[in-house]
């Protein structure tokens, strides 16, 4: 099962993420957990989140990039859900061997994230990749949609279809 942990503080403003979720939702065995919908008060049900993670083979962290990082509720989710003794540390093997895909949208163009005057995606992904590896997850190359503020609907739809194809390809390779 693919579990999408979706974290967008203003989901009604994001056409890109909406289209990504719509495309992913057409696939079989996909569960979408919208953190800002489930936990508007930031009071995370850790047991429910861990149960959802235990059912997944592929975990997707989908969100808009905010200040070169994750939205606050996703960071809190990581702090609360990925606990010692469950996700890491002595006895913390619940996530070992599962795959993790970082699916991120940005307002800036792809060239904005090349090494030079701005940090590149290899640098920006390091904290998430380190978290994944520490929890025994298999890190997959990230999926990113850029220029989402200025893209027309056709471009956004095409990129959202690429996201769906990425998930479908993972399903085909990992579950026949």
From Swiss-Prot:
Membrane-protein topology: Peripheral membrane protein
One Pfam family name is Flavodoxin_2
Q: What is its EC number?
A: 1.6.5.2
Q: Which GO terms describe its molecular function?
A: electron transfer activity; FMN binding; NADH:ubiquinone reductase (non-electrogenic) activity; NADPH dehydrogenase (quinone) activity
Q: How does it assemble?
A: Homodimer. Interacts with KefC.
Q: What is this protein called?
A: Glutathione-regulated potassium-efflux system ancillary protein KefF
The entry's FMN-binding residues are: 8, 14-17, 65-68, 105-108
Cell compartment(s), UniProt: Cell inner membrane
Gene3D superfamilies for the chain: 3.40.50.360
Q: Which reaction does it catalyse?
A: a quinone + NADH + H(+) = a quinol + NAD(+); a quinone + NADPH + H(+) = a quinol + NADP(+)
UniProt KW keywords: Cell inner membrane, Cell membrane, Flavoprotein, FMN, Membrane, NAD, Oxidoreductase
What does this protein do, in the record's words?
Regulatory subunit of a potassium efflux system that confers protection against electrophiles. Required for full activity of KefC. Shows redox enzymatic activity, but this enzymatic activity is not required for activation of KefC.
Cofactor(s), names only, from the UniProt record: FMN
* Top enzyme class: oxidoreductase
Q: Might you name a Gene Ontology BP term for this protein?
A: potassium ion transport
Q: Name one GO cellular component term.
A: plasma membrane
Name the family the entry cites: Belongs to the NAD(P)H dehydrogenase (quinone) family. KefF subfamily.
Establish whether keyword Hydrolase is in the entry. Answer: no
């Amino acid at each position: 099962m693919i579990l999408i942990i979706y974290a967008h503080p203003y989901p009604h403003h994001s056409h890109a993420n909406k289209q990504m979720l719509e495309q992913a939702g057409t696939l079989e065995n996909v569960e979408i957990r919208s953190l800002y919908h489930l936990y508007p008060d930031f009071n995370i049900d850790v047991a429910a989140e861990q149960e959802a993670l235990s059912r997944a083979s592929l975990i997707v962290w989908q969100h808009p990039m905010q200040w070169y990082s994750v939205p606050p509720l996703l960071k809190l989710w990581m702090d609360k859900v990925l606990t010692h003794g469950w996700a890491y540390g002595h006895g913390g093997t619940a996530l070992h061997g599962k795959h993790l895909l970082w699916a991120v949208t940005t307002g800036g163009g792809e060239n904005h994230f090349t090494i030079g005057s701005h940090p590149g995606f290899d640098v920006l992904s390091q904290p998430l990749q380190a978290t994944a590896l520490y929890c025994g997850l298999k890190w997959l190359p990230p999926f990113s949609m850029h220029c989402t503020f200025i893209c027309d609907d056709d471009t956004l739809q095409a990129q959202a279809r690429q996201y769906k194809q990425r998930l479908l390809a993972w399903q085909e390779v990992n579950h026949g």
